[in-house]
Design a protein with these regions (language model features):
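Rossmann-like NAD(P)H-binding beta-loop-alpha module
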Residues: 75-114
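Conserved acidic residues
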Residues: 35, 57, 91
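Basic, gly/Ser/Thr/Pro-rich low-complexity segments located predominantly at protein N termini
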Residues: 47, 58, 102-104
């Protein structure tokens, strides 16, 4: 963590520690001092998916996958990445979801040279919460989107081998 913080500081990032917005400084003061403000609280807990097979090997929470990839790109030793557990290389990857985290996952899997990358999303393209630009970029990179689809079960003997999906039929 300290090494990463030093890399970020060297890149021009200022860290203000033990400072609470609204108590120690107002949001208006921040806006006066800076051209842009990024508030990134982060996701602290993965959403659980409740379908059969979720406990099979090869089913990976998005944040674990992305964190391992980021750590590896920063030069860290990441045993789970090196073993293949958190590395998409030469794998058929299925990402469930349609938000920005899902888009980060599909595009990271492409960069890791996955054999194929498919994204299942329960709504249609026009109603997904993720960035449309990211979707377009992912499509151009070869990601296959299965709109109006949701996972029904993950199948395999010990390790996930396939995903049974169900089609969603919107009501007009």
């Amino acid at each position: 963590v300290l090494r990463r913080a030093e890399l970020l500081k060297a890149g021009g990032i200022d860290f203000i520690m033990n400072c609470e917005i609204g108590r120690d400084i107002s949001f208006a003061e921040l806006r006066e001092k800076h051209e842009a403000i990024l508030i990134a609280t982060g996701v602290y807990k993965a959403r659980e998916i409740k379908i059969p097979g979720v406990g099979l090997d090869g089913v990976v929470p998005a944040l674990d996958f992305l964190t391992a990839s980021n750590r590896k790109s920063l030069g860290d030793d990441v045993a789970e990445f090196d073993s293949g557990a958190l590395n998409a290389e030469n794998k058929d990857v299925v990402v469930i979801g349609g938000g920005d985290t899902a888009m980060d996952c599909v595009r990271t899997a492409v960069r890791q040279n996955a054999k194929s990358v498919t994204c299942l999303y329960r709504r249609d393209k026009a109603n997904m919460p993720g960035s449309q630009r990211e979707v377009q970029n992912a499509e151009e990179e070869g990601v296959n989107f299965q709109w109006l689809s949701a996972p029904h079960a993950l199948l395999g003997d010990g390790s996930v081998r396939s995903v049974r999906e169900r089609r969603i039929h919107p009501v007009s």
